[in-house]
Amino acid sequence: MKKQGAPVSGGGTERLTKPSCLMVGSAVAEGVSAQSFLHSFTLASSAFNLQVATPGGKALDFVGISETDSRWFQDFQLKPYSNPARLESIDGSRYHALLIPHCPGALTDLANSGYLARILQHFTAEKKPICAIGHGVTALCCATNQDKSWVFQNYSLTGPSVYELVRRPEYASLPLILEDYAKDSGATFSASEPDAIHVVLDRHLITGQNDNSTMPAVQNLILLCNGRK
């Protein structure tokens, strides 16, 4: 049986004082942006006890690892906490914050995950901070109410713009266009120019448009959690 990762923490005292954050990634091939994950993980681990989780507890498969960052990922994958927990076994009530980095694979698995939907429903009901970036925002589409309405209707958010998506060779076969889904579901969607830093904060929900929006989005998550203490 695969050993699940333990939350990232420092010493015992530090672990008790830090809030816990669930970091969810896609489990599909080339499912997680290396740049967004690295920035999310390093920044968030300074403020939270992090627990990484994926569907089935499958290993993260990173896309776009640069030569500069390759050593960091080699070291990361040797750590026990690099082994994700099973998303199916996660109890959302144990976590203070939820972070979903830019995950191109989210279109395939997270956007249809009933387990993530339950976690998001809990976080929304309790107004706990949620931060999603790039295609990680698409993962939010899994969360619907009993009447099939979207949990995030009436929220303002951002995510990959059509102008960013159209550059992808698989654009014509994408199962979901976030901008269309959000607008059709009653949310307010905004986007800046392609690759620009653009972050939207609405109540307890923080969304970033793309990879480049990762750091300011996570910084807002930390500030939001600090303000709730």
Swiss-Prot record:
Domain of life: Eukaryota
Gene Ontology biological process terms in this record: methylglyoxal catabolic process to D-lactate via S-lactoyl-glutathione
GO MF annotation terms: glyoxalase III activity
Gene Ontology annotations for the cellular component aspect, listed alphabetically: cytoplasm; early endosome; extracellular region
Keyword annotations from UniProtKB, A to Z: Endosome, Glycoprotein, Secreted, Signal
Subcellular location field: Secreted; Early endosome
Keyword Lipid metabolism: no
Glycosylated position list: N154, N212
CDD domains: GATase1_Hsp31_like
Signal peptide (from-to): 1-34
Family annotation (InterPro entries): Class_I_gatase-like, Prot/Nucl_acid_deglycase
Family: Belongs to the peptidase C56 family.
Subunit structure: Homotetramer. Component of the FERRY complex.
Task performed by this protein: Component of the FERRY complex (Five-subunit Endosomal Rab5 and RNA/ribosome intermediary). The FERRY complex directly interacts with mRNAs and RAB5A, and functions as a RAB5A effector involved in the localization and the distribution of specific mRNAs most likely by mediating their endosomal transport. The complex recruits mRNAs and ribosomes to early endosomes through direct mRNA-interaction.
Protein name, as recorded: Glutamine amidotransferase-like class 1 domain-containing protein 1
Record organism: Xenopus laevis (African clawed frog)
Lineage: Eukaryota, Metazoa, Chordata, Craniata, Vertebrata
Gene name linked to the record: gatd1
